[in-house]
């Protein structure tokens, strides 16, 4: 996968730049800017990159001082990669959901819940599987070697490698009127989780896009609304749920698919975010949330103590 690598490279470069120019007080801002540059340069979605970098460190907490530096780095990176020949993925939907229909409104609610649960399934299963695999086979080389043989056989048996790689083949099929099977999303999810759990290093973001898009096609057909619009909604919302981010999936949906279905996109992404239960594929993000919650509690306790002192002094 490229996303994880790109973000990590951007983060390391920005961190080292901050140290070199001796600005430790801006270390977190430099980190956000570097991550935004990595994401923005890869996907050429600078707005999504900015909010992804800000949200992925600590969900529910935004460091607004990092907004302008992150925007500068993300747009510069996206422009540079474009000049160097990297093509941005975009899809013309050409269809718009009619929000005056009750059926469409109810379908959006179902989609938001569905995509949220699937994103949660991905992140939760990944963390659980990593622990189980690590406990079952302690030696990482034996674990990777033994399970990889089994995995390779399965990948070959199921449509000759259809579920290997990043999943761009499923994304293309979803938006180019290709063949999407009803079980594509679950097999892609299972194989991706197993591959990462045994110790292979790879990306999660693009596979999440493919899982969401293929699930969206299935859901759209079952609900009787535009499958391609549902694929676009799933593309963004499953990613948002699995990464425990809200603004980033909304922005990536707008930048990749346009603004025709902006309201359905926002509604579905909000519902998916609410359904994920705080679960994330990035465990460091979860620790940051706990730390921030602890800080908030500490502040509240200090505030209560000060009030008690003031009351005692008045008495």
Predicted features, each with a name:
Residues 2-315:
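Alpha-helical transmembrane segments and immediately membrane-proximal extracytoplasmic
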């Amino acid at each position: 996968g490229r996303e994880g690598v790109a973000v990590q490279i951007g983060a390391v470069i920005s961190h080292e730049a901050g140290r070199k120019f001796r600005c430790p007080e801006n270390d977190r801002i430099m980190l956000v800017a570097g991550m935004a540059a990595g994401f923005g340069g890869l996907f050429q979605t600078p707005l999504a990159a900015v909010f992804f970098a800000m949200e992925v460190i600590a969900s529910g907490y935004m460091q607004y001082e990092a907004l302008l530096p992150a925007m500068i780095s993300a747009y510069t990176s996206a422009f540079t990669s474009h000049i160097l020949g990297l093509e941005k993925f975009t899809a013309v939907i050409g269809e718009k959901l009619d929000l005056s229909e009750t059926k469409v409104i109810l379908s959006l609610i179902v989609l938001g819940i569905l995509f949220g649960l699937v994103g949660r399934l991905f992140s939760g299963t990944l963390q659980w599987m990593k622990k189980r695999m690590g406990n079952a086979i302690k030696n990482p080389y034996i674990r990777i070697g033994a399970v990889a043989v089994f995995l390779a056989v399965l990948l070959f048996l199921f449509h000759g490698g259809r579920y290997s790689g990043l999943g761009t083949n499923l994304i293309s099929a979803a938006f180019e009127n290709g063949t999407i099977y009803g079980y594509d999303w679950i097999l892609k999810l299972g194989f991706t989780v197993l591959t990462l759990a045994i110790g292979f290093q790879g990306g999660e973001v693009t596979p999440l896009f493919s899982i969401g898009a293929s699930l969206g096609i299935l859901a759209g057909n079952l609900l009787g609304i535009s499958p391609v619009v549902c694929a676009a909604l799933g593309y963004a919302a499953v990613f948002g749920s699995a990464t425990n981010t809200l603004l980033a999936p909304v922005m990536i949906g707008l930048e990749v698919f346009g603004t025709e279905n902006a309201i359905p996109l926002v509604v579905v992404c909000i519902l998916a975010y609410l359904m994920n239960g705080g679960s994330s594929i990035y465990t460091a993000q979860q620790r940051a949330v706990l730390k921030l919650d602890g800080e908030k509690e500490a502040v509240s306790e200090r505030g209560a103590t000060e009030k008690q002192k003031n009351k005692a002094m008045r008495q």
